[in-house]
Design a protein with these regions (language model features):
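C-terminal and inter-domain tail/linker signature
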Residues: 1-160
């Protein structure tokens, strides 16, 4: 039986996690998820996803919009007493085909493992900087010195 409170389990899971995502094989990613996964990546997806079956659409969409994305671990942080871990990563790749195919992105993010059930990830939270990624791909304008939410608000005024 696997124990999420074991530092070796958390290390092994993080390694398997990055291997699965870098494989671009949906089944390999889904195999790490508990059937009742709660997946919170509302940076990218419009709502929290519930259940492994619902994850297939999400994972396939990742491959469609970032066809050659690669993830590299920067550092693993673990809280074995709580059965949690955080993978600080760098992601690099190109964007969707409708954007400039010559442009690439390179940003940091975090995969936050909030819970495990039966050795599978059951609660997940994603955090990463999508606006910087979109600027690097040419989909958003430069910040031009705008601070905080002022940049996002300036994008709204461009569309009026």
């Amino acid at each position: 039986m696997t124990d999420a409170h074991d530092p070796a389990f958390l290390r092994r899971f993080a390694d398997d996690w990055l291997t699965a995502w870098n494989s671009h094989d949906t089944e390999q990613v889904l195999a790490l998820l508990h059937p009742r996964i709660e997946w919170d990546d509302t940076v990218f997806w419009p709502e929290v996803i519930h259940g492994r079956d619902a994850m297939r659409t999400y994972v396939d969409r990742i491959w469609a919009v970032m066809p050659d994305v690669r993830f590299e671990e920067v550092q693993l942080f673990t809280a074995p007493a709580d059965g949690r871990a955080l993978v600080l990563f760098r992601q690099e790749g190109s964007g969707p085909p409708q954007l400039d195919p010559g442009k690439r992105f390179s940003t940091h993010g975090c995969d936050i493992f909030l819970g495990f059930t039966d050795g599978l990830l059951s609660r997940y939270l994603a955090q990463y900087e999508i606006t910087d990624m979109m600027r690097q791909l040419g989909a958003l304008p430069p910040r031009e010195g705008k601070v905080g939410g002022a940049y996002l608000l300036s994008l709204m005024s461009r569309n009026r």
